[in-house]
Regions:
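Second-shell loop/turn segments in exported
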Residues: 18-22, 60-69, 98, 136-144, ...
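Beta-strand segments within the central parallel beta-sheet cores of soluble alpha/beta enzyme folds
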Residues: 46-50, 91-100, 125-127
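Phosphate-handling active-site elements
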Residues: 80-94, 119-121
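His/Asp/Glu-rich mid-to-C-terminal helical/loop segments that flank catalytic regions of hydrolases
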Residues: 81, 199-233
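Metal-dependent peptidase/peptidase-like ectodomains
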Residues: 99-198
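Soluble metallo-hydrolase cores and metallopeptidase-like ectodomains found primarily
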Residues: 1-65, 81, 85-86
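Soluble non-cytosolic domains of exported or imported proteins
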Residues: 23, 66-74, 88, 103-107, ...
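Solvent-exposed, polar/charged alpha-helical surfaces in well-ordered, non-transmembrane soluble domains
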Residues: 74-81, 110, 151-155, 181, ...
């Protein structure tokens, strides 16, 4: 089979005009909460769970974003509730961060890396969630400098979740397309967690009817145990 690039030089130059509204006073909000670690010393180290809370909105019809990225927000909040009630107490503190402005150019994650609320060297991992509500298998993307994060996520899956898991080691970073890439580029130990499968992307049909509850539940359990293993290592 011969593969051809889908992009090519046409030799033409195009000029595009568009009407847009610019609001210099527009603001976004990152929302953070924390469960303090149980160890008197290790509680001063942090595991951050992040998921962007925004989507496209009206363009001009409603793009609900059930998978991208409400599924991740639901998983993060589910883990926050489970950890708060669990008898297994994380030794390190867990920060839950709902990041704004991902679809508007990764503005929320970029803002956090420039204005961190806890010392960067005290963050032992960022677990960034992206689209965990559609598909049949789990995926993890991690920077090659932090293979232990992938190993702990694999351990969590093997012991408690038992789903097919694809892991990808990243050796270089190009133009960031996810908050996880922003955190990696800023030097944070970060792993992107997602679910793999064909779903609607930036499409009106990315709604609640497209969500697979089974994979969303599996991703939430996977996040829970991965967080426990990292926080207590």
């Amino acid at each position: 089979t011969t593969l051809f690039r889908s992009s090519f030089h046409t030799g033409k130059r195009a000029h595009i005009k568009m009407n847009a509204t610019y609001n210099p006073n527009a603001t976004g909000k990152n929302i953070l909460g924390m469960i303090k670690g149980s160890d008197p010393i290790l509680c001063n180290e942090y595991v951050i769970i992040s998921a962007h809370l925004d989507h496209l909105g009206m363009i001009p019809f409603l793009i609900e974003g059930a998978n991208d990225n409400n599924s991740s927000s639901a998983a993060m909040l589910g883990v926050a509730e489970a950890l708060a009630k669990s008898k297994i107490k994380p030794k390190r503190s867990i920060i839950f961060m709902s990041v704004d402005g991902e679809e508007a150019g990764l503005t929320g994650s970029t803002y956090y890396t420039n204005h961190p609320l806890v010392p960067k060297d005290k963050v032992i991992a960022i677990l960034n969630l992206e689209q965990v509500g559609v598909g049949q298998m789990l995926g993890a993307n991690y920077h090659y400098k932090y293979p232990e994060l992938a190993k702990l996520s694999q351990k969590a899956n093997a012991m408690y979740v038992h789903r097919r898991l694809f892991t990808n080691e990243t050796h270089f970073l190009t133009r960031p397309r996810t908050d996880g890439a922003v955190f990696m580029k800023a030097g944070y130990p970060c792993i992107d967690l997602w679910a793999l499968g064909s779903g609607y992307y930036h499409h009106p049909k990315d709604n609640i009817r497209s969500i697979n509850p089974d994979i969303l539940r599996a991703a939430t359990e996977w996040l829970y145990w991965t967080t426990i293993f990292i926080a207590n290592k």
